[in-house]
Structure formats: C-alpha cells, structure tokens
UniProtKB/Swiss-Prot annotation:
This is C-X-C chemokine receptor type 6. InterPro entries: CCR1-9-like (IPR050119), Chemokine_CXCR6 (IPR002235), Chemokine_rcpt (IPR000355), GPCR_Rhodpsn (IPR000276), GPCR_Rhodpsn_7TM (IPR017452). Glycans are attached at residue 17. It is a multi-pass membrane protein. It is found in: Cell membrane. Belongs to the G-protein coupled receptor 1 family. Residues 61-69, 127-144, 217-232, 295-343 are cytoplasmic. The gene is CXCR6. Its main location: membrane. The keyword Disulfide bond applies. Keywords: Cell membrane, Disulfide bond, G-protein coupled receptor, Glycoprotein, Membrane, Receptor, Transducer, Transmembrane, Transmembrane helix.
Length: 343
C-alpha cells in the first residue's frame, strides 16, 4: 500500500509551475510501473517462502520450542500481509475498483499483519536472549514457556487488531483524479504515526540492540566451532532489519515534521523506493528465521521428496551428517532448544 497522500492529487500540484507539474507527471508514470512490479515480486517470493515455512513447521518440524511457536505465527502474518499486495498493485496501475468494504478490510488486514510481524520479531529476539543467557532456567521451564508463548501470540494478534482500528474505521475510497483507497484523518494521524513508529520500528530495534548485544557477549565466551556462524547470523539479522526498515521509517518521520517536502518530487521518489525496500522483509524473514536451521533444511528436502519435485539424491544423509556435527556446539547445555541455534 502506497504510504502517501498527495501523489495522485493533481489539484495539489496545480498551484506549482509547469516544470513541477511535468516532474509530477513523470513521477506518477514511474510509480505506476515501479510499485506494482515490486509488490508482485514481494508477493511471489513472500508467498512461496512463507508457505514453505508454514507447511514444514506444521507437518514436519512440529512445535518443539517456544521459538517454533513464534516461527509459525511470523510466516502466517507475513503470508497474509503479502496477499494484500496484488490489490494495491492493481490499484496502482489503474484505480481502486474493489469498493469501500474491501478498502477497509484490506487496510485492516495489511496493518494488523504488519504489527503482528514486527511484534513477533521482537518476541523471537527476547526468546533467544532467554535461551542463551539464561539457558538452565529456560530448559527447566520449557513446557511453561511453550504455554506462555501461545498466550503471547494470541495477545499479539489482539493488540495488533486494536491498534489497527483507526485504519479500519477511517479507511475510505477517495476520488483524486482516480479512485484511491487510503487512510486519512488529520486529527489522529499523529497518534497513528507514533504507534507505527513505536511498535513497528523502535521497539523491535531497541530490543534487538539490547538482547543481541548480551547474546554476542555470551557467545564470545562460549566454546564450540559454531560460535562464529551464530554470530554471523545475528549480524545478518540486524543488518537486514536496519537496511530494510530504517530508510522508510526515517522518511516517514521527516515527512511528518516537514510538510514542505510534499512539494519536492524527489522526496516522493524516496518514499516509494524506501517503502518497496521495507516490504522486502516479508521475503527475507523465512530465510533469516527458518532456513538457517539445519533441521529445517532437512525437513525441506523431505517435503521435496514427498511431493516428488526432485530426486532425493542422498540429501538426507548429507543433512544428517551436518546436523550431527553441529551438536558439538554449546554456549550452554541446551542452546539447541531454539531454532536459531540448531545450525
């Protein structure tokens, strides 16, 4: 969903000179091609990746740890999120033809799953912190933690629904040269933006910085040949989050405090490009939080064999050998309780 207000409003740009209006028209042509293409790329990649994670987690991997509970809800949220993108892609090329009810529904679904995804990423970070730093306690309370994890996931979905109500209530179809589905309410827009920035960026970012800093310190004092691999994964997770989410959130923050940027066509380009980059998280989450696990990759090849897409080619033995070798790694006696560190 394009996060802008005036791009399609020709009346907004009629007050500017001919050169500015020409730049605006060029931008509109660019956005009609760029955003729908990016939406479809994210949709296809996110659909395939998150569907694989869900199928393997439910039918092959089972729920063996608290992280596994989160890794079922994360691809579910991302999967529903990417399923809204074809609608926004079509509306970007043409106009909104799906009516007001679908407008409110898709705005709600889009926002709910955005918040859910970010909050679950935060919970995964905290869970990894507990398992690595407080390994013995986590191991002894594994059953209790599983129960609490399911409750936490339910609460996350409820909280996401509640904070998405403004988009659902105030979302509507507007006629700005063409029909557009968007959320727009000046009175509460500041509160909505603050909620988006807090739950969707600052909370997961600060949690990652604090928790992963302590985890890195713990791993540096741990033995095992897989220590460096785990550190690389942590740095990769942080780098992907910063590179995909920071630019768009920074642009939104600037836009909310400096309205004069609306008159700059170059700033409009910045918004849609950073927005597209931010949406890549829905494609990358399956790789960062599932496919890094040897057990998950082994189950993936089992799925490939079961559906008959490719010959097995002795893959099972390959992963079995790698998995046995990985078990020599230990930052504590039960680091393997999490999906991330079953590398």
């Amino acid at each position: 969903m394009a996060e802008y207000d005036h791009y399609e409003d020709d009346e907004f740009f009629n007050s500017f000179n001919d050169s500015s209006q020409k730049e605006h028209q060029d931008f509109l042509q660019f956005s009609k091609v760029f955003l729908p293409c990016m939406y479809l790329v994210v949709f296809v990649c996110g659909l395939v990746g998150n569907s694989l994670v869900l199928v393997i987690s439910i039918f092959y991997h089972k729920l063996q740890s608290l992280t596994d509970v989160f890794l079922v809800n994360l691809p579910l949220a991302d999967l529903v999120f990417v399923c809204t993108l074809p609608f926004w892609a079509y509306a970007g090329i043409h106009e909104w033809i799906f009516g007001q009810v679908m407008c409110k529904t898709l705005l709600g679904v889009y926002t709910i799953n955005f918040y859910t995804s970010m909050l679950i990423l935060t919970c995964i970070t905290v869970d990894r912190f507990i398992v690595v730093v407080k390994a013995t306690k986590a191991y002894n309370q594994q059953a209790k933690r599983m129960t609490w994890g399911k409750v936490i996931c339910l609460l996350i979905w409820v909280i996401s629904l509640l904070v998405s109500l403004p988009q659902i209530i105030y979302g509507n179809v507007f006629n700005l040269d063409k029909l557009i589905c968007r959320y727009h309410d000046e009175e509460i827009s500041t509160v909505v933006l603050a909620t988006q920035m807090t739950l969707g960026f600052f909370l997961p970012l600060l949690t990652m910085i604090v928790c992963y800093s302590v985890i890195i310190k713990t791993l540096l004092h741990a033995g095992g040949f897989q220590k460096h691999r785990s550190l690389k994964i942590i740095f990769l997770v942080m780098a992907v989050f910063l590179l995909t989410q920071t630019p768009f959130n920074l642009v939104k923050l600037i836009r909310s405090t400096h309205w004069e940027y609306y008159a700059m066509t170059s700033f409009h380009y910045t918004i849609i490009v950073t927005e597209a980059i931010a949406y890549l998280r829905a494609c990358l989450n399956p790789v960062l939080y599932a496919f890094v696990s040897l057990k998950f990759r082994k189950n993936f090849w089992k799925l490939v064999k079961d559906i008959g897409c490719l010959p097995y080619l002795g893959v099972s033995h390959q992963w079995k050998s790698s998995e046995d070798n990985s078990k020599t790694f230990s930052a504590s006696h039960n680091v393997e309780a999490t999906s991330m560190f079953q590398l």
